From Swiss-Prot:
It comes from Escherichia coli (strain K12). Keywords: Cell inner membrane, Cell membrane, Membrane, Transmembrane, Transmembrane helix. This is Inner membrane protein YidG. Residues 1-21, 69-90 are cytoplasmic. The chain crosses the membrane at residues 22-39, 49-68, 91-113. Residues 40-48, 114-120 are periplasmic. It is a multi-pass membrane protein. It is found in: Cell inner membrane. InterPro entries: DUF202. It holds the Pfam family DUF202. The lineage of its organism: Bacteria, Pseudomonadati, Pseudomonadota, Gammaproteobacteria, Enterobacterales.
Length: 120
């Protein structure tokens, strides 16, 4: 069994590299679609905090794109999972997804409050 990930992929590619690549690409597309929806539905009532969060989310989307692009270029060693930049990228991806979910939750809760006030 070859030691490097790239050599193993060349020796027996299987479907795992393709599935992983497609999963990251699907994550990036879904993330982009959610960002577009956030801008579409909230631009009219957006304050400075909204635009700052959209800017941060766009930066993290670029990091996600960079991370998925570099997955095919790197060889994985045992220390790669403890290196700072790898852990940072994964943390920022998770943080971006969480913050986008919170943004949508707050927006929907606000809409529910407005609806309940109109009904009452």
């Amino acid at each position: 069994m070859p030691d490097s990930r790239k050599a193993r992929r060349i020796a027996d590619p299987g479907l795992q590299p393709e599935r992983t690549s497609l999963a990251w690409f699907r994550t990036m597309l879904g993330y982009g679609a959610l960002m577009a929806l956030a801008i579409k539905h909230n631009w009219h009532q957006a304050g400075m905090l909204f635009w700052i969060s959209i800017g941060i989310l766009a930066i993290v989307a670029l990091i996600l794109w960079h991370y998925t692009r570099n997955r095919n270029l790197m060889d994985v060693t045992n220390s790669d999972f403890s290196q700072f930049h790898v852990v940072r990228d994964k943390f920022l991806i998770s943080l971006a997804v969480l913050s986008l979910a919170i943004l949508f939750a707050v927006t929907h809760i606000h809409q529910l409050i407005v609806f309940i006030e109109r009904v009452a």
